[in-house]
């Protein structure tokens, strides 16, 4: 059931503002959503998307002067229970499930069925299991109501959240970056469920940074910028240029444009031969040249991150040789690699890269603080100047260098981590999912930095699951499948770098590769 021009809005958020101490997170924002509509919400990190949805879900109270209407009736969302009773459900990036409880217990949480006395009676688990069988079957769940949630995959746990929303008779479902932890196949299955819910009349508010998802799913797209409403586009009016301009307030032309000179094939920086580990990487070889951006693509589980960590010395290798320039490089630890001029930006910046409870200044300086030591004491002034220079050079949006990194947006956190690596003056830089979880503006700035590094003669390896990104920034692309290099595109092969060619190599579909040419 898609929206018709004559249908009445299901949700109207009018003149919504929210002020925190010294920060106005939302300023007079309005949003209208119809039944049977997938309405995407876009904006850079910090634009106000999450704050607006937390007001809708009852987690925050809006400032005075705004109102929320459902089916034309004004409602007072004074907490999460009020939102649930009004038919609003939210599925956050961090799933809100109890792993030690069953599927049925998670679906009924806060609404448990009891024997006898509804308040004090014992929980009737059998009745709850029976009560959610229909919704699980309706959503095609491959598990039963008595399954422990902790035994399910992330995609299956997400399905439990959707089942809970449907079971509570939610009419408005908010999904915040739901595909971030999913494989391509799991993402397609999720899209099928979202379309099914739309056909059943639910209003879906879909938050994502991924343009391909926005194009594939959206009936309309609304954009926020700096806490204000910018505008709404109908599906037929969508274009990357218009969306990006609305989000960042400026035109980002040549989003993936290669702005560095062709690399020098005679200047080899990194040579890897027959490298392997005990489990995931099975004899991989590659070359990286000065000024080259080398992309590594492949499906989830193909071994891309494992290969990068082997080269970096973060994991032990069972065989293989690595050379930096003309010298053998036997890194036994990341410290060895950094000292030799090879650095690695992890895909998991929060757990493996940043010190979230430390300042921006300390995060930037931590890899090179030994340079500032004088008679055993750190030169704090030099470290502070280095941090200020990095903030200016990488356009890190932060009030000052003393702010904790944990308080920054994803894009600014990524730039802090990248600036730390660049302070080591690397010859080779490995970037693992460098734009994951960052907004459009930050992506553009990261691409600019990659181009600048290549122009300066640094060799850059980019591992990414976003095919347009790989195609746009890389001079050559290696495609991995099941721990091996399945093929090479671009460069001396003269094989065009296309999505079809990458997918064909990643899946082993040689017939599809032939069709691409």
Curated annotation (Swiss-Prot):
ATP binds at residues 43-50. Keywords: ATP-binding, Cell inner membrane, Cell membrane, Membrane, Nucleotide-binding, Repeat, Sugar transport, Translocase, Transport. Part of the ABC transporter complex RbsABC involved in ribose import. Responsible for energy coupling to the transport system. Residues 11-251, 263-507 form the ABC transporter domain. The lineage of its organism: Bacteria, Pseudomonadati, Pseudomonadota, Betaproteobacteria, Burkholderiales. It is an enzyme of class 7 (translocase). Transmembrane segments: none annotated. SUPFAM superfamilies: P-loop containing nucleoside triphosphate hydrolases. Its main location: membrane. It is a peripheral membrane protein. The keyword ATP-binding applies. Belongs to the ABC transporter superfamily. Ribose importer (TC 3.A.1.2.1) family. Its EC number is 7.5.2.7. It holds the Pfam family ABC_tran. One of its GO terms (molecular function) is ABC-type D-ribose transporter activity. It comes from Burkholderia ambifaria (strain ATCC BAA-244 / DSM 16087 / CCUG 44356 / LMG 19182 / AMMD). SMART domains: AAA (SM00382). This is Ribose import ATP-binding protein RbsA 1. The complex is composed of an ATP-binding protein (RbsA), two transmembrane proteins (RbsC) and a solute-binding protein (RbsB).
């Amino acid at each position: 059931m898609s929206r018709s021009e004559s249908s009445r809005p299901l949700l109207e958020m009018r003149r919504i503002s929210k002020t925190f101490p010294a920060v106005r997170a939302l300023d007079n924002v309005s949003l209208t959503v119809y039944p049977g509509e997938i309405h995407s919400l876009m904006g850079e990190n910090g634009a106000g998307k999450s704050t607006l949805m937390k007001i809708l879900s009852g987690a925050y109270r809006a400032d005075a002067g705004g109102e929320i209407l459902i089916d034309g009736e004004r409602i007072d969302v004074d907490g999460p229970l009020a939102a649930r009773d009004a038919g609003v459900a939210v599925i956050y990036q961090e799933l809100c499930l109890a792993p030690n409880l069953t599927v049925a217990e998670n679906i009924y949480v806060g609404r448990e069925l009891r024997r006898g006395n509804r308040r004090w009676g014992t929980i009737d688990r059998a009745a709850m299991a029976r009560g959610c069988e229909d919704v699980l079957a309706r959503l095609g769940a491959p598990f039963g109501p008595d399954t422990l949630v902790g035994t399910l995959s992330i995609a299956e746990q997400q399905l439990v959240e959707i089942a809970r929303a449907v079971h509570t008779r939610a009419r408005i479902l908010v999904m915040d970056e739901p595909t971030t932890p999913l494989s391509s196949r799991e993402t397609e299955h999720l899209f099928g469920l979202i379309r099914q819910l739309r056909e059943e009349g639910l209003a879906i508010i879909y938050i994502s940074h991924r343009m391909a998802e926005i194009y594939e799913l959206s009936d309309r797209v609304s954009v926020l910028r700096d806490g204000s409403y910018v505008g709404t586009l109908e599906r037929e009016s969508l274009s990357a240029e218009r969306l990006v301009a609305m989000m960042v307030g400026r035109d980002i032309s040549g989003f993936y444009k290669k702005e560095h000179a062709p690399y020098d094939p005679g200047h080899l920086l990194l040579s890897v031969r027959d490298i392997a580990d005990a489990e995931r990487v099975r004899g991989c070889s590659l070359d990286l040249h000065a000024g080259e951006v080398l992309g590594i693509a492949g499906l989830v589980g193909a071994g891309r991150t494992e290969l990068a960590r082997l080269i970096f010395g973060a994991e032990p290798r069972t065989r293989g040789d690595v050379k930096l320039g003309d010298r053998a490089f036997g890194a036994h630890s990341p410290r060895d690699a950094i000292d030799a001029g090879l650095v690695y930006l992890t895909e998991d910046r929060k757990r493996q890269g940043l010190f979230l409870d430390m300042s921006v200044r300390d995060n930037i300086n931590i890899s090179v603080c030994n340079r500032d030591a004088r008679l055993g004491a750190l030169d704090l002034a030099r470290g502070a100047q280095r941090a200020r220079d990095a903030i200016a050079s990488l356009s890190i949006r932060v009030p000052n260098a003393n702010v904790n990194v944990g308080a920054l947006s994803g894009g600014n956190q990524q730039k802090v981590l990248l600036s730390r690596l660049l302070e080591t003056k690397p010859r080779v830089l490995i970037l693992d999912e460098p734009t994951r979880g960052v907004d459009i503006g930050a992506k553009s700035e990261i691409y600019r930095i990659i181009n600048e590094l290549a122009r300066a003669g640094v060799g850059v390896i980019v591992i990414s699951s976003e095919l347009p990104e790989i195609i746009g920034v890389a001079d050559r692309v290696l495609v991995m499948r099941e721990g091996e290099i399945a093929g090479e595109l671009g460069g001396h092969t003269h094989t065009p770098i296309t999505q079809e060619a990458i997918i064909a190599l990643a899946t082993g579909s040689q017939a599809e590769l032939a069709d691409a040419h």
